[in-house]
């Protein structure tokens, strides 16, 4: 997280929620232990800012087997050698993530691997994922996220809002996956959403949002 982003979020009086495909401990690390509610694995593992667990709903073994079989089929169509040292498959509990280049590939490699998402879309066109209970979404810069079709970011954001007794009209969501088949798409229609390109764009929009709020515009 950018130091200026950390300071901006830290000083906000509103509740901050990080919704991510990553595991909760990694969210904490990536955000420099910023005090936030954390919805990891597309919201299927939720914790309070102090670490108190709100819920955790992992995939079952049958679903894991179904996902891994599809990933193995996808691997046959990847147009390069897969570097297994870069962890192409991560089982995060409630979510399994496949990155053809590797989940822990260097950032500079990830940035140029599939910026327009076409490589991943072509893979899914070649090997469609057909499941009664599961879906796959394009997530992050290089990954495909497999989750339960009824337990995605949209349902989990709504679940948290209901649990906390908040008003949906008071909530706003910033995401880079607010497009068809994106891993933020399910939040559209749940609360107000704003599409961002990357972390720098997120910072600029948040800074503008906070400035306008102070002026009474928002």
State where each predicted segment sits:
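Mg2+-dependent phosphoryl-transfer enzymes with acidic/Ser/Thr/Gly-rich catalytic loops
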Residues: 149, 153-218
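A structural signal for isolated positions on well-ordered beta-strands in alpha/beta enzyme cores
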Residues: 15-17, 37, 97, 172, ...
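Residues at the C-termini of beta-strands that transition into short coil/loop
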Residues: 39-42, 140, 197
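Short, glycine/serine-rich, charged loops/turns that create anion-binding
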Residues: 23, 43, 102-105, 178
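Conserved acidic, metal-coordinating active-site core of Asp-based
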Residues: 82-172, 180-183
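Short glycine-/acidic-enriched loop or helix-start segments at secondary-structure transitions
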Residues: 27-29, 50, 108, 183-184, ...
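Alpha-helix C-terminal capping segments
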Residues: 8-13, 27-32, 126-131, 183-189
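Active-site phosphate-binding/coordination module
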Residues: 1-88
